[in-house]
């Protein structure tokens, strides 16, 4: 089964309740095994592919997530649009726990993750000034707004700071990220978004705010208990938002520059790429060979 729309579920979102005609697909990729089986099915009759980012039993640390295998797996299943649901902490007073942010920017503070499919004889530099697809993010934000969910405040843009984890921020770090203009902080959307761009998949994030990190003087520092309590309240909303977004993307697929991200990004002449590397990356390079 193939699908043009993929969904990555973060902490708390380990399955899609609305999925029908469910089929589990286990893949092995040139970059190892993905986080779990891909769950193929339909939402409102629309084919989709779902993956639990940390595994369905949440057994993977953020650093341990096989980001390249996950994105490669989505690509091999035909995915062109990828919706990422992620738990985040807020770095701004105006962005409250239980709010929803659709980020338009990222700051990468990870340090132990491979962030590219390339190397081994091929060099590519993707454009990443706009790290999410504005068209897909717009569809997502419009779906949230039109659902008019109770007690949900939508923030149509913001900067997601991606830290390495698994420990939460120190107070000094949290205040530093605030001074940079960070809106929310999480541990998983990078290198995920970079790899999606290299795979020419349009990517957008549904960021579910669970806490105020540790900077807020009137709120307790973040704990797992706090996160999970608020996240469970957000998961029901996330399910509804994703279902509505899937319907809209299927009805009117947004035009995305991400779908041609490699067109002018590859510097190495393709006839000079080692055969083994070309074979490994054939899924990404096929239309340029």
Swiss-Prot record:
Catalytic function, reaction form: S-methyl-5'-thioadenosine + phosphate = 5-(methylsulfanyl)-alpha-D-ribose 1-phosphate + adenine
InterPro entries: MTAP (IPR010044), Nucleoside_phosphorylase_d (IPR000845), Nucleoside_phosphorylase_sf (IPR035994)
Gene Ontology, cellular component aspect: cytosol
One Pfam family from the record: PNP_UDP_1
UniProt EC number: 2.4.2.28
Binding residues for phosphate: 11, 53-54, 86-87, 188
Any one GO molecular-function label of the UniProt entry: S-methyl-5-thioadenosine phosphorylase activity
Site (Important for substrate specificity): 169, 224
Pathway the protein takes part in: Amino-acid biosynthesis; L-methionine biosynthesis via salvage pathway; S-methyl-5-thio-alpha-D-ribose 1-phosphate from S-methyl-5'-thioadenosine (phosphorylase route): step 1/1
Functional note: Catalyzes the reversible phosphorylation of S-methyl-5'-thioadenosine (MTA) to adenine and 5-methylthioribose-1-phosphate. Involved in the breakdown of MTA, a major by-product of polyamine biosynthesis. Responsible for the first step in the methionine salvage pathway after MTA has been generated from S-adenosylmethionine. Has broad substrate specificity with 6-aminopurine nucleosides as preferred substrates.
Subunit: Homohexamer. Dimer of a homotrimer.
Name by which UniProt lists this protein: S-methyl-5'-thioadenosine phosphorylase
Gene name for this UniProt entry: mtnP
